[in-house]
A protein has these predicted regions:
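N-terminal chloroplast transit peptides
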Residues: 2-4, 11, 27-48
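Intrinsically disordered, low-complexity polyampholyte segments enriched for Lys and acidic residues
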Residues: 10-11, 16, 50, 55
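Compositionally biased, intrinsically disordered low-complexity segments enriched in Pro/Arg/Gln/His
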Residues: 20-22
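SAM-dependent transferase fold signal centered on methyltransferase-like domains
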Residues: 33, 47-50, 55-735
Length: 735
């Protein structure tokens, strides 16, 4: 049958029908009906399976096309009001809207909404760089700039009011002199007329009348007749206010809005610029700069979508070149009171180190108290011991090798900013310095003061760190700032002199291991407690939906507030010269930098890790101050010397966790720390009597003295909420 059907097809030249045509399908179905039942069944089953698969493909493609058509019809224009998850179609591309704070940014719909490249490379790389991990950084920056800006705007307003009052006083004085000159001229004219017409008897009365009227009109600020007679001008324009007696002249400057300008030097998507414009109410202008034209186009797109074209100016160019263009500007023209072209705030948030931008930034920000915000994400350089040569070339100092490396990194960054500014007679004042996750963020005020710059050498230190032994350290200032009485004996002045040679040897006095050198680095305070407190005071007023990281901000700023130990009181009776209002004392040095970790110390002497509260209680009972550092959990910051810290650790081991015999060998750091190198008699005496304080008192682990038991639960040290919590990869390709 099959052979006959094939021969019949060739004889009549019937083409083989494709399965996608309905007519051919009908023809084949008719032929199958003529065939044997079994052959008909097998042929029909295969045919209809094939037709069904094709129909499914057609159905899927049709549904996709319909979905795309529906999405195209639902897509909104760039001018639509921004909203979360909004679909925007612009210039042939589709975008999805992401909200952070009060700003909205557009990301390509083809890419992931919250991009995060895993080590396996599962997700697509970004075409527009957006890192949601740094929302904490951006939230904190908005609050810090707002706290700084409120004070800066108030300072500008006070200076402007003072200038207006000075100009107004000069204008009033000139007006009085003109009025007096006019009055004297009228009186003289009236006296001459009276002498010529009526005689001397009537001159006195007429003169008194004219003089009285003139004084009355002058007091009211009107004097229309006199002004008309003397100048010949019409008197319709008001020159005074008869109700309150205050003069209003065109020469007196009127109150104006204070300018507040911000530079987002490395803007990427423009998210920071958008947030600063939306969330800082007194911001008048924000410049969003980026090197790549693709990034600038993205910035313009986001600015247009957020309807902020009047506030944000996008610039395509090198950030260093852009900032150097403002280097020659002065903050204020003393003769004409011209506003400065320099920025009030410059935000540096690069991918990696900010070191190449610092020299230009300190010259482009206002030098009468401008704010510099700096982020450095290269913690592998300034907080590790792997690249000391790279750290020195970028920050001018060597990193610390040890548990306190992150605080050392902050001080290296501040040292780089301070040394860059000092070349131009600029002094820095750190307001807030934080080590966060994988990056550092510092907020620094810049002001012109060659006198304050002289303190920099005495606020710069090197660190001798026993990183291979017990972990102790010693600091050494490069110079000394000494307070001396002046020649009259009624005042004092600061004298800047050389420091002594290194006061410590190459070996650690506690364990005998070799020390390593770190620095030079910043030795001044890391924070301004008043500035930090102002931010904390604003947190309860914030909308938690807008600022989603306020819980962590509160915890970290509370730690920053607590870790700032006040300097010790002066031992002499000399009174330092007064510090200008609004400035920090340039002579203050952080006498107690860095911290120690009880778990690390217990590892040295091979004992059970002591309770943090017990160690703090022992230090407090001995009269020392204790707090903790924001850089790492489990840290203790204190003004106690390392010699006493090891006394506390030895006493803890003696009372609570005796060391097993043979656990510490003579080649270990703990051998000398525990006093095992001393004679047997001395060891036995110490074991019986225990450690004593410097005053000969017993060491007591007074846990009841510790008041930092968390009554209010704060997120002081956040655990990474998900995997791959880091800086992410650079953006690739056009948006």
């Amino acid at each position: 049958m099959i052979q006959w059907l094939t021969a019949w097809q060739k004889k009549f030249q019937v083409p083989k029908p494709p399965s996608r045509h309905r007519a051919s399908s009908t023809f084949l179905s008719f032929l199958c009906m003529l065939l044997a039942p079994r052959l008909q069944f097998q042929f029909a089953r295969g045919f209809f399976r094939k037709c069904g698969g094709i129909n499914r493909v057609i159905s899927i493609r049709t549904s996709h096309a319909m979905s795309a058509a529906n999405a195209q019809s639902e897509a909104k224009d760039i001018t639509a009001s921004p909203a979360i998850g909004q679909h925007i179609h612009h210039d042939g591309k589709d975008y999805t809207t992401i909200k952070e704070g009060l700003a909205y940014i557009l990301v390509p719909s083809a890419g992931p909404t919250v991009p995060q490249t895993t080590p396996k490379g599962d997700n697509q790389p970004q075409s527009v760089f957006y890192n949601p991990i740094q929302q904490f950084n951006r939230d904190l920056s908005v609050l810090a700039i707002k706290a700084y800006g409120e004070e800066a705007v108030a300072r500008k307003k006070a200076a402007d009011d003072k200038k207006r009052k000075t100009v107004s006083a000069k204008s009033k004085k000139r007006k009085r002199e003109e009025q007096d000159a006019k009055s004297n001229g009228v009186e003289k004219m009236a006296r001459l007329d009276d002498e010529a017409g009526n005689g001397k008897a009537d001159v006195g009365e007429e003169s008194e009348l004219v003089e009285g009227e003139t004084r009355e009109n002058t007091a009211m600020g009107v004097d229309e007749a006199t002004t008309t007679a003397a100048e010949g001008k019409d008197t319709d324009k008001p020159v005074g206010n008869a109700q309150n007696g205050t003069a209003e002249t065109s020469s007196t400057p009127k109150p104006k809005q204070q300018t507040f300008t911000i530079l987002d030097a490395l803007s990427a998507t423009g998210l920071r610029a958008l947030r600063y414009s939306q969330e800082i109410p007194f911001t008048t202008s924000v410049t969003a700069n980026d090197l790549l034209p693709e990034a600038t186009r993205t910035i313009n797109l986001n600015v247009e979508h957020n309807r902020l074209t009047s506030k944000i100016n996008s610039v395509t160019g090198n950030a260093i070149t852009h900032m150097y263009a403002f280097a020659g500007e002065t903050p204020l023209d003393s003769n004409r009171y011209k506003p400065s072209k320099k920025y009030d705030v410059i935000d540096l948030d690069p991918y990696g180190t900010a070191a190449p931008f610092l020299d230009a930034a300190v010259q482009a920000v206002r030098d009468d108290g401008g704010l510099l915000c700096v982020t450095c994400t290269d913690a592998g350089v300034w907080a590790s011991n792997g690249y000391p040569e790279k750290c020195y070339s970028l920050y001018g100092g060597l990193p610390i090798k040890g548990m306190h490396s992150h605080e050392g990194g902050l001080r290296l960054i501040l040292h780089a900013i301070a040394s860059s500014a000092a070349r131009y007679g600029l002094a820095i004042e750190p307001l807030l310095s934080l080590s966060i996750d994988f990056y550092a963020r510092v907020f620094v005020k810049i002001h012109k003061s060659p006198a304050d710059v002289k303190f920099l050498a005495g606020k710069t230190m090197v660190v001798y760190s026993c990183d291979q032994g017990c972990g102790a350290w010693e600091t050494q200032l490069l110079a000394r700032n000494l307070l001396k009485p002046n020649k009259s004996g009624k005042g004092t002045y600061w004298k800047h002199v050389f420091a002594q040679a290194p006061t410590v040897g190459p070996e650690c006095q506690h364990c005998g291991r070799n020390r390593h050198l770190a620095g030079p680095m910043w030795a001044g305070p890391l924070h301004d407690v008043n500035f930090v407190q102002r931010i904390l005071d604003e947190l309860p007023k914030l909308d938690k939906e807008t600022y989603q990281t306020t819980t962590r901000i509160e915890g970290m700023l509370t730690l920053a507030l607590e870790e700032t130990l006040a300097p010790p009181p002066r031992t002499d009776e000399l009174v330092p010269p007064p510090v200008p209002k609004g400035r920090a004392d340039p002579s203050v040095v952080d006498a107690f930098p860095f911290y120690f970790i009880p778990s690390v110390a217990s590892k040295v002497i091979h004992c059970v890790t002591p309770d943090e509260i017990a160690i703090k209680g022992a230090l407090l009972h001995a009269g020392y101050r204790v707090t903790r550092s924001h850089t790492k959990a489990g840290t203790i910051k204190t003004d106690a010397p390392w010699s006493f810290i090891w006394k506390v650790m030895r006493e803890w081991s003696r009372q609570r966790s005796p060391v097993k015999e043979g656990a510490i060998r003579d080649n270990m750091p703990g051998w000398k720390v525990m006093g095992l190198d001393k004679p047997k008699e001395e060891q036995e005496k110490r074991a019986l009597d225990g450690e004593k304080t410097d005053e000969g008192k017993e060491i007591v682990f007074a846990e009841w003295l510790v008041k930092d038991a968390d009554k209010k639960k704060l997120v002081r040290y956040q655990i990474n909420p998900r995997e791959n919590w880091g800086p992410m990869n650079r953006a690739k390709g056009p948006a």
